[in-house]
A protein has these predicted regions:
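An N-terminal-biased, well-structured beta-alpha scaffold segment characteristic
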Residues: 6-111, 115
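Short, Lys/Arg-enriched N-terminal segments with co-localized hydrophobic residues
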Residues: 1-5
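Glycine/serine-rich phosphate-binding loop and adjoining beta1-alpha1 elements at the start
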Residues: 7-9, 85-174
Length: 178
């Protein structure tokens, strides 16, 4: 073939601060159908119930050595900016996509730019109709709000939904989400 296969990769996030992942098996399947090769850290989605075998069955390459993933990939997608030791492995013309928080990580981003590494900070995407399908702020804020409501109901002293039973009706709880 005339073209090299582009490799997209993702590394384990710092699980103390980030439980989400960027590539679920469903997303990996989409990338592969587009002709991309996918590489992930071993146990990448384990904490969310995604086993390495689920990924391998789709054709995803699983690596124990994250530096090997970095060196051999074209695009790295992460939720947060990778750690300094991982960033130091990046080479010219690679691309990092994620929530890079460039205002707080200005020095790190500047260093990546000096190394000619492409950066796409999804948290800076304009909130316009054309970019709506990539608007991570709205989707994640929506998810956070949903989780906040569910978490708060654990402390609520009444039944939440309206319940109609043979014994009677319990009206729905009224809450204010701020």
């Amino acid at each position: 073939s005339l073209f090299e296969v582009m490799i997209i990769a993702s590394l384990l996030e710092d699980q103390k601060i980030e439980k989400r992942i960027t590539i679920t098996p469903e997303i990996a399947k989409k990338y592969i159908s587009l002709g991309l090769e996918v590489s992930l850290s071993s146990n990448y989605g384990e904490h969310l119930g995604f086993k390495d075998n689920q990924y391998k069955e789709l054709g995803v390459k699983i690596f124990k050595n994250e530096k090997e993933i970095i060196v051999n990939s074209d695009i790295i997608v992460q939720l947060g900016l990778p750690t300094d030791d991982k960033l130091s492995c990046l080479k010219e013309n690679q691309t990092v996509i994620g929530i890079l928080n460039p205002y707080s990580n200005k020095e790190k981003i500047d260093n990546l730019i000096k190394k000619k590494i492409n950066n796409f900070s999804l948290d800076l995407l304009p909130r316009i109709t054309r970019a709506q399908s990539m608007d991570i702020l709205s989707s994640q804020a929506n998810l956070a709000g949903y989780k906040a409501v569910i978490d708060s109901f654990a402390y609520f002293q009444k039944a939440i939904p309206m319940m109609m039973t043979a014994a009677g009706t319990i009206s729905a709880a009224k809450v204010l989400v701020v």
